[in-house]
Amino acid sequence: MKKNIILNLIGLRCPEPIMIIRKTIRDMKDNEKILILSDDPATKRDIPNFCYFMEHKLLKNEIKVKPYRYLLKKGL
């Protein structure tokens, strides 16, 4: 069974968001999705890079207004 997760990281600053995202994704199955909410400006750079290097798919990002929203899918 696939599950979709919402991860509220508002108020956390680098490196905490990426550490929590990595731990959460580790427990997910391939193709499960996670919606991440954050207000840390560093996530605009860190999350796309994390997805690239860890081979996950960044499906959508909304970074014009806070909270920033990122939709990721585990795996490619």
Swiss-Prot record:
Organism: Buchnera aphidicola subsp. Acyrthosiphon pisum (strain APS) (Acyrthosiphon pisum symbiotic bacterium)
Pathway where it operates: tRNA modification
Subunit-level organization: Interacts with IscS.
Active site: 14
Keyword tRNA processing: yes
Recorded superkingdom: Bacteria
Biological process terms in GO annotation: tRNA wobble position uridine thiolation
Biological function: Sulfur carrier protein involved in sulfur trafficking in the cell. Part of a sulfur-relay system required for 2-thiolation during synthesis of 2-thiouridine of the modified wobble base 5-methylaminomethyl-2-thiouridine (mnm(5)s(2)U) in tRNA. Interacts with IscS and stimulates its cysteine desulfurase activity. Accepts an activated sulfur from IscS, which is then transferred to TusD, and thus determines the direction of sulfur flow from IscS to 2-thiouridine formation. Also appears to be involved in sulfur transfer for the biosynthesis of molybdopterin.
Family, per entry: Belongs to the sulfur carrier protein TusA family.
Protein name: Sulfur carrier protein TusA
Cellular location(s): Cytoplasm
Entries under Pfam families matching the protein: TusA
Keywords per UniProt: Cytoplasm, tRNA processing
Main location: cytoplasm
SUPFAM superfamilies: SirA-like
The keyword Flavoprotein is annotated on this UniProt entry: no
NCBIfam families in the cross-refs: PRK00299.1
Gene3D superfamilies reported for this sequence: TusA-like domain
GO cellular component: cytoplasm
